[in-house]
Regions:
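DNA-contacting interfaces and partner/effector-binding or oligomerization modules
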Residues: 1-54
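Short, charged, surface-exposed hinge/linker loops at domain edges
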Residues: 1-3, 38-100, 104-105, 109-114, ...
Length: 135
């Protein structure tokens, strides 16, 4: 199975964009799910058009493939804070990063790798806790 890497970004207007790292495919939508679905539809449309017109297309489109998504920290924070799932205070408790700094990340400041790792670690810890409760 071919693995396709895609990047998720949230625009300032609240919409989402998904684009493949090494392929030509992308998608956009008002929600993250809509952007992912738009990219999948574009991949299907590309293949259908290529077949109908006799053009070459990436071989992985004929078989099974998996899309692996990566999200930038600002988009990740915006998604969960914007949806009301987390507050900045809650993220501060999970990550140890103060709310003012998290707010800066939410508004476009790119966190250093160490700060990104702290955010990821905090979210993974929450995931582990939830998995242990509901396993």
């Amino acid at each position: 199975m071919t693995k396709i890497e895609a990047i998720i970004e949230r625009a300032k207007d609240g919409t989402y964009t998904v684009y493949c790292k090494d392929e030509i495919f992308s998608g956009a939508g008002d929600t993250l799910a809509a952007a992912k679905e738009d990219m999948r539809r574009q991949m299907d449309f590309y293949k259908e058009t290529a077949v109908a017109e006799g053009f070459k297309y990436p071989a992985f489109l004929d078989g099974e493939y998996e899309v692996s998504y990566t999200v930038d920290m600002a988009s990740l924070i915006a998604y969960y804070v914007g949806a009301g799932i987390f507050s900045l205070a809650g993220l501060e408790k999970m990550t140890g990063i103060n709310q003012k700094q998290l707010w800066a990340y939410l508004n476009g400041t790119t966190p250093r790798k160490t700060q990104s790792a702290r955010i990821e670690s905090g979210l993974r810890h929450l995931n582990d806790d939830l998995n242990s409760i509901f396993a």
